[in-house]
Amino acid sequence: MSVVPLMFRDWWDELDFPMRTSRLLDQHFGQGLKRDDLMSSVWNSRPTVLRSGYLRPWHTNSLQKQESGSTLNIDSEKFEVILDVQQFSPSEITVKVADKFVIVEGKHEEKQDEHGYVSRQFSRRYQLPSDVNPDTVTSSLSSDGLLTIKAPMKALPPPQTERLVQITQTGPSSKEDNAKKVETSTA
């Protein structure tokens, strides 16, 4: 096997994968691009095994975390969603609970900025765990545009160590009935 094809290959071939435009058209559209924004869409559409033959799973794992606009935390105490909505004013965001879902929507009409006209809209749905009471969901918006949605988990009832047993009253004493049954079975 020769090393020459690896050293003198056309490196543009590695970039000849279908571009994923969803990264470029995400919720930050209109704020300008960074160099990493363009390259991440190329790396994200590539398989994790490069032409060199090495498996590089950290490429896809780190990009999946980076592309997510929200963070979902579920533990034994709470359900929590943190969502970056800095492009929207508080009046343009709605948070509602329907059935077992939290639905977050944001929309603002066309606005003119230095690049032209921009219109943004998003909708996200998060399924509540069965341990969460939908009536306890709260939301807060920080000054830097992070929307936090929280709900506590239902508290488990404490384990009972002692239990009172009810006594039901019956007719005649069952002691006499049991004695008659024993006599007839021995005879």
Curated annotation (Swiss-Prot):
It comes from the Eukaryota. InterPro entries: A-crystallin/Hsp20_dom, Alpha-crystallin/HSP_16, Alpha-crystallin/sHSP_animal, HSP20-like_chaperone. Ubiquitously expressed during embryogenesis with no sign of tissue specificity in expression up to stage 16. GO terms for molecular function: unfolded protein binding. One of its GO terms (biological process) is sarcomere organization. Residues 151-187 are annotated as: Disordered. Residues 174-187 have a biased composition (Basic and acidic residues). The keyword Disulfide bond does not apply. Keywords: Developmental protein, Stress response. GO terms for cellular component: cytoplasm; nucleus; perinuclear region of cytoplasm; Z disc. CDD domains: metazoan_ACD. Residues 61-170 form the sHSP domain. Belongs to the small heat shock protein (HSP20) family. Vital role in embryonic development. This is Protein lethal(2)essential for life. It comes from Drosophila melanogaster. The gene is l(2)efl.
